[in-house]
Amino acid sequence: MAHHEVISRSGNAFLLNIRESVLLPGSMSEMHFFLLIGISSIHSDRVILAMKDYLVGGHSRKEVCEKYQMNNGYFSTTLGRLIRLNALAARLAPYYTDESSAFD
């Protein structure tokens, strides 16, 4: 059974399938990463650099946690937040047209 999270805003609820979105090491471009960080609540330079090394650079979780002296549990929590945010952004993307993209 898939894990779902219900997000409710102004009485409108929808299901967001968390497992549809997976962020693997090295799976993200630098532009995609910084756009995602830009809409996140993550502000720590150390945490941002750790996530960048993992998601863009393809470094292992162990390497990143050691390099940035990050607790593995905090790494998992932060990565989970980015996974949920990425899934939400992917669900929102069809509502925006190609003409509205300033980065193409």
Swiss-Prot record:
Compartments, record wording: Cytoplasm
Gene Ontology annotations of biological process type: regulation of DNA-templated transcription
Alphabetical list of InterPro entries matching this protein: Adhesin_operon_reg_prot (IPR004356), Fimbrial_Adhesin_Reg (IPR053721)
Keyword Cytoplasm part of the UniProt annotation: yes
Pfam families: PapB
Coiled coil: none
Segments traversing the membrane: none
Record key words, sorted: Activator, Cytoplasm, Fimbrium biogenesis, Repressor, Transcription, Transcription regulation
GO cellular component, one term: cytoplasm
Function: May act as both positive and negative regulator of pap transcription. Might positively regulate levels of papI and/or mbf. Its autoregulatory mode of action involves differential binding to separate sites.
UniProt protein name: Major pilu subunit operon regulatory protein PapB
Organism: Escherichia coli
Lineage: Bacteria, Pseudomonadati, Pseudomonadota, Gammaproteobacteria, Enterobacterales
